Amino acid sequence: KEGYLVELGTGCKYECFKLGDNDYCLRECKARYGKGAGGYCYAFGCWCTQLYEQAVVWPLKNKTCR
């Protein structure tokens, strides 16, 4: 599974500005989803890869980013 890293409290994607390989996104994806996860910056949001199927990613139901 893959998807955008989401702030569970707000429903917002984690923003990033250095597209492609991005240490911040990689670190945050691993912190949320475990050391097997990957991550990079895609369309100014942290995109996480190699996730387990039940991983929660953006968009969240009933939560819109404001």
Swiss-Prot record:
Residue ranges occupied by any LCN-type CS-alpha/beta domain in the UniProt entry: 1-66
Compartments where located: Secreted
Lineage: Eukaryota, Metazoa, Ecdysozoa, Arthropoda, Chelicerata
Protein name: Beta-toxin Chui3
Keywords, sorted A to Z: Disulfide bond, Ion channel impairing toxin, Neurotoxin, Secreted, Toxin, Voltage-gated sodium channel impairing toxin
Summary of the function given for this chain in its UniProt record: Beta toxins bind voltage-independently at site-4 of sodium channels (Nav) and shift the voltage of activation toward more negative potentials thereby affecting sodium channel activation and promoting spontaneous and repetitive firing. Acts on human sodium channel Nav1.6/SCN8A.
Swiss-Prot/TrEMBL domain comment: Has the structural arrangement of an alpha-helix connected to antiparallel beta-sheets by disulfide bonds (CS-alpha/beta).
Primary localisation category: secreted
GO MF, one example: sodium channel inhibitor activity
The species this protein was found in: Centruroides huichol
InterPro entries noted in UniProt: LCN-type_CS_alpha_beta_dom, Scorpion_toxin-like, Scorpion_toxin-like_sf, Scorpion_toxinL, Scorpion_toxinL/defensin
Miscellaneous remark of the record: Is neutralized by the single-chain antibody variable fragment 10FG2.
Tissue spec. comment: Expressed by the venom gland.
Protein's UniProt keywords contain Disulfide bond: yes
